[in-house]
Amino acid sequence: MAFLILLRHGKSVWNEKNLFTGWVDIPLSQQGIDEAIHAGQVIKDLPIDCIFTSSLVRSLMTALLAMTHHSSKKIPYIIHDDEQQKLMSRIYSDEEKSMIPLYRSSALNERMYGELQGKNKKETAEEFGEEQVKLWRRSYKISPPGGESLYDTGLRTVPYFQETIFPLLKNSKNVFISAHGNSLRSLIMDIEKLSEEEVLSLELPTGKPIVYLWTGHTFERHPEPLG
């Protein structure tokens, strides 16, 4: 058995400005920082063996802030993809036992919003029409100009989860994923076997952990909302 913790990052500066963010690398706002800290207090007693974030800083900030409250007192350390940096950052002492590996991957990045990135959501609706923007944002396979649909997002998140993260869970490793609304929705769609209609109605608030237990055969969602 193993725990899987999913956490949408805390509110970002552009969330507060009502701007499409996507892959633009925007940090957390003060509210987002507070949300990440609160989330850490909620999950502080759940076992965590490894952490995964997207390549975007708001996802990383959320994970690091949340872990400052973990009861294990273990320190996250980033495992870099670059082989030279990985070699140069090796730890040669027992200090490694007091740390938790953190892996970053663009496979977990937010849905890329293409030509909408940086634009105000209200002004975009006025420019293109509310129905068109609703199609871009809330349909499953329709993507904004130059961007990704939720379906496209799942084409990178789900294989990464199945090939990299799921084997750890099957090996009884407890995993914490700090990512984004749409990347997590695509993962939950796969985990819970949701239909297209069901995933479109799925809303994930910022800074609210979702916890699953991998039983060895299936994922069981924690029955009560956390936090």
Swiss-Prot record:
It comes from the Bacteria. One of its GO terms (molecular function) is phosphoglycerate mutase activity. InterPro entries: His_Pase_superF_clade-1 (IPR013078), His_PPase_superfam (IPR029033), Phosphogly_mut1 (IPR005952). The record marks H180 as: Transition state stabilizer. GO terms for biological process: gluconeogenesis; glycolytic process. The active site is at H9, E110. It catalyses: (2R)-2-phosphoglycerate = (2R)-3-phosphoglycerate. Substrate binds at residues 8-15, 21-22, 58, 110-113, 121, 137-138, 181-182. Pathway: Carbohydrate degradation; glycolysis; pyruvate from D-glyceraldehyde 3-phosphate: step 3/5. Catalyzes the interconversion of 2-phosphoglycerate and 3-phosphoglycerate. This is 2,3-bisphosphoglycerate-dependent phosphoglycerate mutase. It comes from Chlamydia caviae (strain ATCC VR-813 / DSM 19441 / 03DC25 / GPIC). The gene is gpmA.
